[in-house]
UniProtKB/Swiss-Prot annotation:
This is Spermidine/putrescine-binding periplasmic protein. GO terms for cellular component: membrane; outer membrane-bounded periplasmic space. Pfam families: SBP_bac_8. Keywords: Periplasm, Signal, Transport. NCBIfam families: PRK09501.1. It comes from Escherichia coli (strain K12). The keyword Transcription does not apply. InterPro entries: SBP, Sperm_putr-bd. CDD domains: PBP2_PotD. SUPFAM superfamilies: Periplasmic binding protein-like II. Belongs to the bacterial solute-binding protein PotD/PotF family. The gene is potD. It is found in: Periplasm. Spermidine binds at residues 36, 85, 168-171, 327.
Amino acid sequence: MKKWSRHLLAAGALALGMSAAHADDNNTLYFYNWTEYVPPGLLEQFTKETGIKVIYSTYESNETMYAKLKTYKDGAYDLVVPSTYYVDKMRKEGMIQKIDKSKLTNFSNLDPDMLNKPFDPNNDYSIPYIWGATAIGVNGDAVDPKSVTSWADLWKPEYKGSLLLTDDAREVFQMALRKLGYSGNTTDPKEIEAAYNELKKLMPNVAAFNSDNPANPYMEGEVNLGMIWNGSAFVARQAGTPIDVVWPKEGGIFWMDSLAIPANAKNKEGALKLINFLLRPDVAKQVAETIGYPTPNLAARKLLSPEVANDKTLYPDAETIKNGEWQNDVGAASSIYEEYYQKLKAGR
């Protein structure tokens, strides 16, 4: 998931303090999730149905979640929601445990096309919760969407000082790497450097970086073109801002937020029950409608309104997904990306 607003940070920190005192209690479950990622009343519904009380705390980046799990090694959390390549990183480091899918009676509701991704083959360690993509956002009132077909178009001089980029090193570099014909998951220092040099050429066109909610600058009229998350664009359209999503010919950037059980979780059985609850069609529908991002749950998608379920910006066709690329862990190369990214922003 991508970072949203920061107004829940203090609440998340308070809940974190409670979770540090995690008791070995099968009637209590400690759930650490992204902000604004669970509909109001949903966890209370789970408690009513199962008798398991959920202590809920939130984070706004994978880095924060990862650091907390590294810090609290006594089993502070029972369920977490890492994104794409963090699933890969955490399973390789032994931070999350294998999931007994035989206890997930609702697992069959998931779209087979959303399973068995490179970051977790066979979904041994993670269960899809929400997915999304980064593509090109276009304010149709200001820019003809048909005039933009590729990431490369963002480099045109006519867009000087008018673009928005997400404030995410991997995403920004993945865009440039795809433009150059490389994998967005490359670990080759020369290819990453080439992307950095390509991005330096783009900087005169960049007006802002935003990963709190990249639709906001479009809605405020600050930008009319740039990177966008498809769910963020959908929410903006619902609010009246005409943001079109263009799937670049070089391919979109796909990510998934998945449910995972920490290796030292104290209430594994409770975590499995909550995962199974969240896989229920009626529940997954609530989640998708609340946060505005696509659900990987086919049974839930059938319950959505046709307007939403058939929206190709939310649910692109198989060819569009195949042409894109899922983010994966790049290991030690992540520091190379971050170093170049900071240089890029400092040199604006």
